[in-house]
Amino acid sequence: MAIRLIRTDDDPVLRKKSRVVDKIDSRIHTLLDDMIETMYEADGVGLAAPQVGILKQVIVIDVGEGVIELINPEIIKETGSQCDVEGCLSLPGHSGEVERPAIVKVRGLNRQGKMVEIQGTELLARALCHEIDHLNGILFTDKIIKE
C-alpha cells in the first residue's frame, strides 16, 4: 500500500468524468488499498479515484462505521434533504453549506465484483453524494448555498 498525492484546487483531472471499471483486478485492489491509506493519512471521511489522479469510478468512505469500498457506484434512490457544511481534501481551506439528500441508496460493486446496495443517512448520505459527484467532475463548491 502507498499514500498517493491528492490532487488539489485547479487540477484539471478534478473536472473530468471518470470511466466505468470494466475489470476488477489486482490494479483496482491496489488502488482501493492506496485510497484507503491516503484517506486515513489525510484525516478524511471519503476519497474518490479522481482525487488521486485516476479517472475510474472508484470511491472509499469511512464515517466511523468501517470502510466502504464501491466500484461503479450509482445513486438509485434519494429521500428528503439536509443542509450542512462540507469540505474536501482536494480543496483545502474551503468550506460551505451544501444541500444533499437526507437518505440515499447507492448500488455498486465491491472489491470481489459482487453487486451491493448501501443505504446511507446523515453523514454517510452526504459522503456518498460528495464522492459520487467527484466521479462526474463536480466539486462541492459548485453546490454551495451559503459560505
Swiss-Prot record:
EC code(s) of this entry: 3.5.1.88
Annotated binding of Fe cation, by residue: C88, H130, H134
Cofactor stoichiometry and binding remark: Binds 1 Fe(2+) ion.
Membrane-traversing stretches: none
Cofactor(s) essential for the protein: Fe(2+)
Protein's UniProt keywords contain Protein biosynthesis: yes
A molecular function (GO) term: peptide deformylase activity
Reactions the enzyme catalyzes: N-terminal N-formyl-L-methionyl-[peptide] + H2O = N-terminal L-methionyl-[peptide] + formate
Positions annotated as active site in the UniProt record: E131
Family to which this protein belongs: Belongs to the polypeptide deformylase family.
Role summary: Removes the formyl group from the N-terminal Met of newly synthesized proteins. Requires at least a dipeptide for an efficient rate of reaction. N-terminal L-methionine is a prerequisite for activity but the enzyme has broad specificity at other positions.
UniProt-recorded name of the protein: Peptide deformylase
Native source organism of the sequence: Alkaliphilus metalliredigens (strain QYMF)
